[in-house]
A protein has these predicted regions:
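Short, conserved secondary-structure transition motifs
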Residues: 287-299
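Acidic, Ser/Thr-rich peripheral helices and adjacent loops at domain boundaries
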Residues: 296-312
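Short, glycine/acidic-enriched capping/hinge loops at junctions between secondary-structure elements
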Residues: 49-52, 263-266, 294
Length: 312
């Protein structure tokens, strides 16, 4: 593909339909490929190295040997990334979409390298290839190399979690006590929806080094509502128009980040069911560990189990 189709990224000036690559040394996409994403990959390698050392399951010798091979493949991936090698085809790992990825890369970006392939393509390719490396293993195919970071981030959110749960409980009881008051229902829904939106601030693929103080600061802004004026495109009212017509229906929520944002999604679902707008809420997690903090099925159950545990 000719590089004429690509555009150098400038904040608020991205040409419509142009592809954004990472060639320019002064933009976010370049910084992502040069610093942010290699840092994430290094964190994966370090977390996995610790997991190998701590492994005490069956067939330990085989698992450790396999772990060393996986570490080598992850290091190879990082080397290819930072030295701008071509994106190589994925190997079959049983997930069923390998051919889709390979056909896409061959059709649109044949011979494309990390710095010449579009930003969104190479970053999603990286997470998919990491998943392939683990899925093709025997002992580590279900290992979540991001779990420890997701767990620590949620535990660091305990103050905001307590405030959020208390607030949702208050909103729910207020609405149930005056269920015919559509204005009250409307205001409560918008508050919950926008709180769920701002939970995205704890996206660990964008902020891999968040400490507990920064997390508390960001989550305090969510609780205060001061962020809402910064929403660039706000269709909350259109969503309310749809939700307000439901009566015991089904609502689907496509999950993004685990931990605090997931809890907000669950509490929004709780409110929708309690006040009668939904009878069923279906959550859609990711199939594999993705973009550091995205929700997997295991993350969902870990959070709900943790919230039930009085000693958590």
């Amino acid at each position: 593909m000719s590089t004429d189709h690509f555009a150098d990224f400038a904040p608020n000036k991205t040409p419509f339909t142009s592809l954004i690559a990472s060639r320019d040394g002064q933009n976010f996409t370049y910084e992502s490929l040069h610093d942010r994403v290699p840092h994430i990959l290094t964190d994966i390698i370090n977390a996995y190295f610790t997991a190998i050392q701590d492994y005490d399951g069956p067939n330990k010798d085989q698992a450790v040997a396999e772990g060393k091979q996986i570490t080598s493949e992850l290091s190879k991936l990082k080397h290819e990334m930072v030295t701008d090698k071509p994106l190589t085809p994925l190997e079959d790992d049983g997930l069923g979409d390998t051919h889709v990825w390979n056909d896409w890369l061959q059709k649109f970006f044949p011979g494309g390298t990390w710095y010449t392939t579009p930003f969104l393509t190479w970053e999603t390719y990286m997470y998919r290839r990491i998943a392939m490396i683990f899925k093709r293993s025997e002992h580590w195919n279900s290992f979540d190399f991001f779990f420890a970071k997701k767990e620590a981030t949620f535990k660091a959110s305990k103050v905001a979690v307590a405030k959020l749960c208390k607030r949702v409980d208050e909103l729910t009881n207020e609405c149930l006590g005056d269920i015919e008051n559509t204005t009250k229902l409307h205001v409560a829904f918008i508050e919950l929806l926008q709180a769920s939106l701002w939970g995205n601030q704890t996206d660990l693929s964008m902020f891999p080094d968040l400490d507990s103080a920064k997390i508390e600061e960001m989550q305090a802004r969510i609780s205060s509502g001061e962020n809402n004026a910064k929403i660039v495109s706000n269709d909350s009212e259109k969503i309310w128009e749809i939700v307000s017509t439901l009566s015991g229906g089904r609502v689907d929520i496509v999950l993004d980040n685990s931990g605090f944002e997931l809890l907000q999604d669950v509490l929004l679902a709780h409110w929708l069911v309690k006040v009668g707008y939904a009878k069923h809420v279906v959550f859609h997690p990711k199939r594999v560990p993705w973009y550091v903090s995205d929700v997997t099925n295991e993350d969902f159950h870990w959070l709900t189990d943790s919230m039930r545990n009085p000693h958590f």
